[in-house]
Amino acid sequence: MKTQKQYLGAFGEDVALQQYLDDQATLLDRNVRYSCGELDLIVRSASGVVVFVEVKTRRGSAFDSAAAVNNQKMLRMRRAAALWLEGKPYTPIRFDVVAIVLDPHTGRPEITVYEDVEHGAR
């Protein structure tokens, strides 16, 4: 049985994925887990770049969702991405962070996409 946090995370991933699909991206993989880290979404952008997406979803604005993606999290994402890329042909890549804050009254998502982050989103 899923927890409320898991439902919130899955909802945020759905919202983020739709944002990429609206921009003509293609979903390659989702919720990929390795011992070194996990990847929420992997998409191919309209320009052919493979994008590894970390999604952070919160209710209200008391906590900055993107701040949860720090250097350590980025390192784990890079390691997981390297494993996912093994054996695949060379392709340009980037790492994005999508911060989603749900309005506590309406539940409406506010989406911020940080593209090509290097050391986390701030």
UniProtKB/Swiss-Prot annotation:
Protein name as annotated: UPF0102 protein Cgl2031/cg2228
Pfam families, per the entry: UPF0102 (PF02021)
GO molecular function: nucleic acid binding
Family: Belongs to the UPF0102 family.
The species this protein was found in: Corynebacterium glutamicum (strain ATCC 13032 / DSM 20300 / JCM 1318 / BCRC 11384 / CCUG 27702 / LMG 3730 / NBRC 12168 / NCIMB 10025 / NRRL B-2784 / 534)
Lineage: Bacteria, Bacillati, Actinomycetota, Actinomycetes, Mycobacteriales
Signal peptide residue numbers: none
Transmembrane feature ranges: none
